[in-house]
Amino acid sequence: MTNGGYEQAKAQRNALEKLGEKIPGYRGFQDRELRREVDKLQREHIANELGRLKAAVRDKTRGYTDAGQIGALNGFDRLDRSLDGLSQAIRFADYGASGIFDAVKIGEAELQRLYDFDLSILDDLAGLEGDIAAVPAPGPSPNDAPATALDKAQQRLRALDDKWRQRERVMTDVVQS
């Protein structure tokens, strides 16, 4: 979700919320809560995308299992566990616990920086999806093993995991800007 996600959510407020804007201090509280909600939705979207990729990995794993090529299954299992770990870390992160949602006034430029960071994560997910799609179907010979493609996907997933862990620092930097 980009800055447009926040603006779209803001535009969908009901009459009671709009009335609350008239109460001193309420608007800042309301905006912080809205940012928390948008952040939560963004994280859920990323976690769901990782779950979708995990399902694709399991489909490919099933193909190798059905073909009796069990030697390749370790690589699939590692990728599956890594996808699950990152998905859970993102889904259950303490949203709103960082300074981005405190009473500090955050400018549009700082928010845009955070949204750009989140967009780059979505771009990385698209790359990971391509890596998983590139894992070959089981072939008749052991030379068709998926190890190289699985390693490439695992490397991209590790980089994505590292990037996600940097998000807290980006959020802190946004507040200090």
Predicted region positions:
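Amphipathic, non-membrane alpha-helical segments in soluble helical-bundle scaffolds
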Residues: 9, 13-16, 36-50, 73-76, ...
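Charged linear interaction tracts used for macromolecular binding and regulation
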Residues: 55-149
